[in-house]
Every structure is written in structure tokens, then in C-alpha cells.
């Protein structure tokens, strides 16, 4: 089994690569390959599209790599391969985004991506830094041995 992380010169590729390599090593999930080669995308078993930055810029970068977007669409729509988008990679699954300008997405999710405008203009978006997490209810994703969880993440919106 091969998981490809698509390299289209958009941001958080290195951290995503390290996370998937660790997951693969711990679970035996197979090879993790970083690529911008459309043929490697077609040959992969699973596809991950990371992304960091503005929706229109990421889309332009992705569609600027010859054949790459077509290979993703073919793998997902025709071959039904599992696909995961991270950050802007996830946003591009929607019909369109409205960050700075209207920009088409893949259209796999019937939705639109709009920039968040906080009620307090002094609040930064995206939020970056350390925060204490308040657990409202148990969830299988949360490890039961963490009594005082906190998280650091750049650009995560919870």
C-alpha cells in the first residue's frame, strides 16, 4: 500500500510527511511517497493533499503542475481512491472558495469556503499558539490517559 503526499509547493508538506511516516511505521500502513508526478498519484493507493496559504494561491500552484490536478480527479472520482485534504487541501474539496476572490474547488463537497471574520477585529485569524483544551465529552480520538491536554497548532480552527 502506498500513500502519496502531493507536493505542489504549498506549505505544510514536511510536517505532514513526518506524521504519515510515523503512522506508517507504527501501523505497517506501507510506503509514504512525496511526489508531484501525476503517474505516481494514479498508482497510489491513498492520496493526501496538504496545503498552507490562501485558497486561490494553492489552487493555482496545484493546477500549475502539468497533469497533477487531472490525476487527482481521476484517482478520486473514477478509481474511488481514499483522499484526505489537510488545511487548504481539505478546503479545495468544496465547490469554491471566496478567500480574496471566487475560486473553483474540486466540487466533491457541496459547499463554499469563506474567510472567517471574528466579531472582535483584534483577534487573529488564523489563531496560532498554545491553548488549553476543555474536553466537553469523551471521544474515541482522545487518549484516555491525558488529564490536562493542550495543543499547539498553526492555522487550526476548532
Describe each region flagged by the PLM.
Residues 95-158:
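Pocket-forming structural segment of enzyme catalytic cores
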Amino acid at each position: 500500500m502506498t500513500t502519496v503526499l502531493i507536493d505542489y509547493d504549498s506549505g505544510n508538506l514536511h510536517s505532514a510527511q513526518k506524521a504519515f511516516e510515523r503512522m506508517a511505521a507504527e501501523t505497517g500502513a506501507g510506503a509514504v511517497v512525496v511526489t508531484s508526478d501525476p503517474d505516481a498519484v494514479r498508482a497510489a493507493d491513498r492520496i493526501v493533499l496538504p496545503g498552507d496559504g490562501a485558497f486561490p494561491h494553492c489552487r493555482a500552484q496545484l493546477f500549475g503542475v502539468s497533469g497533477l490536478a487531472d490525476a487527482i480527479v481521476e484517482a478520486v472520482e473514477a478509481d474511488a481512491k481514499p483522499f484526505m485534504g489537510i488545511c487548504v487541501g481539505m478546503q479545495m474539496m468544496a465547490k469554491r472558495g471566496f478567500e480574496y476572490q471566487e475560486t473553483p474547488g474540486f466540487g466533491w463537497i457541496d459547499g463554499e469556503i469563506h474567510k472567517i471574520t471574528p466579531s472582535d477585529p483584534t483577534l487573529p485569524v488564523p489563531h496560532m499558539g498554545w491553548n488549553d483544551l476543555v474536553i466537553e465529552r469523551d471521544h474515541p480520538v482522545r487518549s484516555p490517559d491525558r488529564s490536562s491536554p493542550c495543543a499547539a497548532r498553526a492555522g487550526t480552527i476548532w
